[in-house]
Design a protein with these regions (language model features):
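Glycine/proline-enriched, intrinsically flexible loops and inter-domain linkers
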Residues: 1-80, 86-107, 111-259, 263-507
Length: 507
């Protein structure tokens, strides 16, 4: 069957509704504030060939990388009804705290597709609470590494024996299993209503439709046979050294294909800012998705139009055993910024840079861990000021409510406010960042993984840059990426970057 326009809309929303229900089951069942309140989790459906059919509107850095996880599971000869667990960044994962559950959906006695749930767990072992140590030089220092394995109670016992908060992890994993089961139930319900052959063909039609729409847009943006669009941007150190690390990209858009070539990017770092290729692909996919009309379904058809080149062993195509905790959350942001910069230099209308960081904050002590990311300023665009205090780019989480944070952890929030005046000046101003100040109520260890502390987000069209962020403890400035002990009474202050302004300010 070939769906008409109405059929594409109906079936596209039917699949997407199942993915959204998976997400709701997860966040309403999870124990940890990071998943329950911040919603640092994602859900999607894949067909039996490993292409994404539909996703919920969750976390870009998760969603674009899930295809690699499904591909890794398919190599394990999944049987109908099997449930797989993984977090290995070099076998389909992103970074170790992101535990992924993949259910092989049984339809008529065969594997009809996959329900996929990825969620950030606030501890998976390793050398520091939160499993994101700033000074890690190997993957193994960041936590337990799980290749694609069938989930069994014994596998769960092994995992829980290697984490600091086993009760919380057990509850969050149960929520993920429930979400994966809801996905399978939803697909079987659609198959019962429409018939399995028709449903399978509808999924193919949706993939082909998204590919056609994507390639049509890219054909209008073609760079032809001319010089590729090029840009370079930098990371502010790797947690071991403060030296800048370069990310270089050349973009060619031709024959309906978007080719991002990262040749010339820095070699893999000693610290934890390295990216597995799946995360790099996710960042490029995010950029391409912003170029498409809203009604184009975000599925594997869009990914068909992408091509990524990255030398093995470089910063954005790291190899085992490079540490990757910050690569997923910080380097992914810079990859997206760099690709956007190349497009802007080529004359494409893109906004000024947003904060370009997730401002990762991890606290932990005996029997507890806490993780959050903090919003900042978005860049302005031609005709609109940038929003303030929002998550930008590869993140899409909420800020943790103060009441929840203080109720469940030995922390007191002294300040939570807009960082007035931090947005870049222009005809349209960049959004303001955030000030978030924590008072320590018990001895603990903290890790900060942040960016844009030296180089503020750039403006566009003559607008000025947003203010760089700052990390302080008791008023003393810290680096962008640090792990340190904290005593009772210490005050940790995070000032997040403002977004860049757009256009010259009219006097």
């Amino acid at each position: 069957m070939t769906l008409d326009a109405v059929g594409l809309e109906v079936m596209g929303h039917a699949f997407a509704s199942v993915a959204e229900e998976m997400g709701l089951v997860l966040v309403h069942s999870a124990l940890s504030p990071n998943i329950r309140e911040r919603r640092d989790a994602s859900a999607a459906l894949f067909d039996a060939d490993g292409e994404m059919i539909a996703q919920a509107a969750h976390i870009p850095v998760h969603l674009g990388a899930l295809a690699d996880a499904v591909a890794a599971v398919r190599k394990e000869d999944p049987r109908p009804g099997d449930l797989f667990l993984l977090n290995d960044p070099y076998a389909g994962g992103s970074h170790l705290p992101d535990l992924t559950l993949i259910g092989a959906i049984e339809v008529d006695g065969a594997v009809g597709g996959y329900s996929v749930v990825r969620a950030h767990h606030s501890d998976v072992g390793g050398m520091t609470p939160g499993s994101m140590p700033a000074g890690a030089r190997e993957l193994y220092a960041e936590g337990i590494v799980i290749p694609p394995v069938r989930w069994t109670p014994e596998v769960e016992r092994l995992l829980l024996a290697n984490v600091r908060t086993p009760g919380m992890r057990r509850g969050d994993l149960a929520a993920q299993r429930a979400a994966a089961m809801r996905g399978a139930e939803g697909v079987r319900a659609l198959a019962s209503r429409h018939g399995w052959p028709a449903l399978r063909e509808a999924a193919r039609d949706l993939l082909d439709y998204a590919e056609r729409r994507t390639r049509a847009v890219l054909s209008r943006l073609s760079t032809g046979g001319g010089t590729p669009l090029a840009a370079m941007d930098y990371l502010e150190g790797d947690g071991v050294s403060d030296s800048d690390l370069g990310i270089k990209v050349r973009i060619t858009i031709a024959d309906g294909t978007f080719h991002a070539d990262f040749t010339g990017t820095s070699e893999a770092a000693r610290g934890n800012v390295n990216c597995p290729l799946a995360v790099t692909r996710s960042a490029v996919l995010f950029v391409v998705r912003t170029l498409l009309p809203d009604d184009v379904p975000t599925n594997g058809g869009v990914q068909r139009a992408l091509r990524i080149t990255a030398p093995a062993g470089c910063l954005v195509n790291a190899e085992r055993p490079s540490a990757v905790a910050a690569g997923n959350v910080e380097t992914s942001q810079r990859i997206a910024d760099t690709v956007f910069r190349a497009l802007a230099d080529g004359g494409l209308a893109v906004p000024a840079q947003g904060q370009g960081t997730m401002n990762n904050v991890t606290f932990g002590g005996p029997g507890w861990t806490y993780y959050e990311t903090i919003g900042g300023g978005q860049g302005a665009s031609r005709g609109a000021a940038g929003p303030s205090a929002v998550h930008v780019g590869m993140s899409n989480t909420r800020n943790t409510p103060i009441e929840v944070l203080e109720l469940e952890h030995p922390l007191r929030v002294r300040t939570y406010a807009l960082r007035r005046g931090s947005g870049g000046v222009g005809e349209w101003a960049g959004g303001d960042g955030v000030v978030r100040e924590f008072e320590v109520l018990a001895p603990m260890e903290a890790t900060l993984l942040t960016e844009r502390r030296r180089h503020g987000p750039e403006g566009a069209g003559g607008g000025s840059a947003g203010a760089p962020g700052a990390n302080l403890v008791n008023g003393a400035a810290l680096g962008a990426k640090v792990t340190l002990p904290l005593a009772v009474g210490d005050v940790v202050r995070i000032e997040t970057p403002g977004g860049g302004g757009w256009g010259k300010r009219q006097l």
